[in-house]
Amino acid sequence: MPLAPRVAVVIPCRNDAVYLDACLSALAAQTHQADVVIVVDNASTDASTAVARAHDAVVVHEPSIGIWPAAARGYDEALDRADIIARLDADSRPHPDWIAKLVRAFVSDPALGVLTGGAEFYGGTPLQNYLGEHWYIGGGHYWIKKWLGIPLVFGSNFAMRARVWERVREHVDRDNARIHDDLDLTIRLRRSDGVRYDPQLRMPVSARPVQTVSGLSRRVFKVASTFAVSWPEGAAWRRTQPSAGSASSDEWAPGGDDWAPRYGR
């Protein structure tokens, strides 16, 4: 990989034009610019495609509705365009140094294959934002790490080397819109992929997923569905143990209706 790796940012989007406009504006304000921003139009009927093009993003279309089909389509598009594939969602609001942190991390550590971070919820009540950050996302990180032995890849805030996606792209259940795309990806990863969680890599995201009991419950129950379709690969006892010479730790710190606008991701 060159010293300055090429970075592609992938954004799956379905009928989220207003959020997408703010997200793309935040990407335009990055201290380190992406080489390409890829917006995957997932059969939108609003102005999402027009918004993406107004920001000079590359627009690709995925007619199969669902986050996993859309995200996978974007990762495929990025394979020949980038060394690092970064991912966020239309309602993400990346801090100005988000891409710079990603690039610094991957350049400084060749063993790093996937880097993910946490969330800062906006738009909800203080209680909703707190529960979203510490119970929904924080709890997911805690329990998935204990079960799988690697950090949970958070779909609204992560990046991976292109070679990692090239290895797993035919193994993930990419056409299944009824499972968590990021959890399914996590299940297909191994310690040897160099998966790390950086607690300082935080992403403002909409509180829409935690603003209704039904929306939150649906997402929690999808965890079971995701493990079910991947079984037994997601079984804790089948996970590869780290070798004695493994150089990576799990943390790095720098010196469907899933698209329903009411609920968000």
Where are these regions (language model features)?
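A conserved acidic beta->alpha catalytic loop
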Residues: 26, 33, 41-49, 92
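Conserved donor NDP-sugar-binding/catalytic core segment of glycosyltransferases
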Residues: 97-127
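Acidic helix N-cap motif at the loop->helix transition within catalytic regions
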Residues: 18-21, 46-54
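Short, well-formed alpha-helical segments that are part of the catalytic scaffolds
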Residues: 15-29
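Short beta-strand-to-loop acidic/aromatic patch adjacent to the donor-nucleotide binding site
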Residues: 81-93
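Glycine-rich, basic loop-to-helix element that forms the pyrophosphate-binding segment
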Residues: 62-80
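Short, flexible, basic/aromatic active-site loop/helix in glycosyltransferases
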Residues: 117-121, 131-151
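Acidic donor-binding loop at a coil-to-helix junction in glycosyltransferase catalytic cores
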Residues: 176-185
